[in-house]
Amino acid sequence: MVAVQGICYTAGVELMLNADVVIASEDTVFGQLEVLRGIMPFGGATVRFVQAAGWQKAMPYLLTGKTFDTQKANELNLVSEVVEKGKQLERAIEVAKEICIAAPLAVQALLASATDGVTLGHTVAFDKMDNYLKPLFESEDAQEGVRAMLERRLPQFQGK
């Protein structure tokens, strides 16, 4: 979870691209300026920026160091949500709390499976999915989730 505001250049963008959820203030300015310094992004932007935005959308910014605003970052799929200036941290905490309501084992498995899809390809990710599902279905949290649904109450997950 990341909340960004103000100027988010180079390493800031690289850190942001490593996050699962990015909440951006409407006034943020982004840029991968490395090519203007004689180097290239080395924290993953050459992969993650392209992966999020697509080759044709990412390259003009990576190859030139041109900066862009929050609206463009949203269009490029680099941020999850844009909020009013000054509300980014509050909103990030709200989203984090929403995630914390979910079963921790399920969240961990979901992130691992999604990462498999991105890093190993969808075929391998589908093949590995049972490795995540079997322990989940056998977990106390899965039993609690079903009970809570039948009893029409919020589940109380324990990460077991």
Q: Each predicted region: which residue ranges?
A:
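Hydrophobic alpha-helical segments typical of transmembrane helices
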Residues: A45-R48, K57, D69, A106-A109, ...
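C-terminal long alpha-helix characteristic of the crotonase
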Residues: I23-T28, T70, V79-D127, K134-E140, ...
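CoA-thioester-processing core
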Residues: A3, Y9-L63, L76, R91-V95
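Short, basic/aromatic-enriched C-terminal tail that caps enzymatic domains
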Residues: G145-K160
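Glycine-rich phosphate-binding loop at the start of an alpha helix
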Residues: T10, G43, T67, G86, ...
